Amino acid sequence: MQRRDFLKYSVALGVASALPLWSRAVFAAERPTLPIPDLLTTDARNRIQLTIGAGQSTFGEKTATTWGYNGNLLGPAVKLQRGKAVTVDIYNQLTEETTLHWHGLEVPGEVDGGPQGIIPPGGKRSVTLNVDQPAATCWFHPHQHGKTGRQVAMGLAGLVVIEDDEILKLMLPKQWGIDDVPVIVQDKKFSADGQIDYQLDVMTAAVGWFGDTLLTNGAIYPQHAAPRGWLRLRLLNGCNARSLNFATSDNRPLYVIASDGGLLPEPVKVNELPVLMGERFEVLVEVNDNKPFDLVTLPVSQMGMAIAPFDKPHPVMRIQPIAISASGALPDTLSSLPALPSLEGLTVRKLQLSMDPMLDMMGMQMLMEKYGDQAMVGMDHSQMMGHMGHGNMNHMNHGGKFDFHHANKINGQAFDMNKPMFAAAKGQYERWVISGVGDMMLHPFHIHGTQFRILSENGKPPAAHRAGWKDTVKVEGNVSEVLVKFNHDAPKERAYMAHCHLLEHEDTGMMLGFTV
């Protein structure tokens, strides 16, 4: 944090003493302070160090083993500048293999950090990132095949903040941790003794791993002292399987200024902001009075995700206004998007996402046996019963020898790291048609090595705030089309990935490799 920002925030926290007595009591005692990840910049040699290790974190009254980058849980926000090369030295102090994927970065397959980029226990990997893409909020996380869900659940995730000349000219809020605030939202399930309770089994392979505790930057319902004016929130849905739907507790609007790959042409005003797993959106919200309010996530129509306490609006964080003013603004225009090129004559690739019917049926049965009808709130019951072969449900063996590890597929094939499915042409636009027809599950589909444009999303034109640069598209029982282009090489040994970002689907086969 720069000295002037530190001094200003120190003053801001001091001003909390000027709040009304009741407000001070709420601020001081009721909620933990929102943890702010360190903003990690390069050293004099243009290098950054990330150390992956295990530690201890406290959630409520219990302490759990967690994993983190440069700490016990989560990680720093790595700051990158467009046009400036950075070398990242990654040290793995875990007792198992891992990888580090740069989600949203347009970098060659050699440094993308997919499942082939293994860092052994006690090992080191160095990658040089030549950043040449617009300012954006991206992130990094493990991509160890078959274990991505568990390693993310244990705590491994960090932000990437890309800056360029264009964004620095805008008067957006930019005081890190004060009026420019990272918000990493994840749900967790804990065992009776307080440890993270991760399971990859038939049920989670079908619907994903989810929990009943929501963490924001690793804390339960924290609060943030915000100066008056515009507050910028960099939202990341870091959940394994839970989609979120952000809103405010007092219905003040959110102004979306950026999606996965950077700024929108102009702010988009919304009252609700659905965010899929792995997606990022930057929003501005006006803090223009003395009234505290909550950022909340509203109930979603996703299998298993309306189980209490998520059957009603659930607090993500409290925003507590303080008596000083910030200087950031909400510009009328933000950036320019290139016009979509002609789609005539482009290579068309068709990807059919599918789940083994046995997995569907067994997973849903186990979900309903564990959680009851609440697990299906908001779902189409007639469609579900058809999917589950309801008449046969009582004759299932609850797992037996069923191989759920390869039960999710793309174009009829479970992921094979040694067999890329196709070769994309470098520097050429392609039209990818991604279908979830015949499958009722939510599949946020993520493509490595590119930022694309959504042509249609689940059979409809994309919403205004989803029409900019994206690396993830919603596929849910329908067809989505995206316009992609790859500007870097990805040879067979370091192929790019395209996969469902519901991590348990990815870990059980719904992923493909492709070369450029």
Swiss-Prot record:
GO terms for molecular function: copper ion binding; oxidoreductase activity. The keyword Repeat applies. It is found in: Periplasm. GO terms for cellular component: periplasmic space. Its EC number is 1.16.3.4. It catalyses: 4 Cu(+) + O2 + 4 H(+) = 4 Cu(2+) + 2 H2O. Binds 4 Cu cations per monomer. Keywords: Copper, Metal-binding, Oxidoreductase, Periplasm, Repeat, Signal. Cu cation 2 binds at residues 103, 141, 501. Cu cation 3 binds at residues 143, 448, 499. Predicted to be exported by the Tat system. The position of the signal peptide cleavage has not been experimentally proven. It comes from the Bacteria. Its main location: periplasm. PROSITE patterns: MULTICOPPER_OXIDASE2 (PS00080), TAT (PS51318). Residues 55-165, 227-292, 399-516 form the Plastocyanin-like domain. Cu cation 4 binds at residues 443, 500, 505. Its cofactor is Cu cation. Residues 1-28 form the signal peptide. Multicopper oxidase involved in copper homeostasis and copper tolerance under aerobic conditions. Is responsible for the oxidation of Cu(+) to the less harmful Cu(2+) in the periplasm, thereby preventing Cu(+) from entering the cytoplasm. Monomer. This is Multicopper oxidase CueO. The gene is cueO.
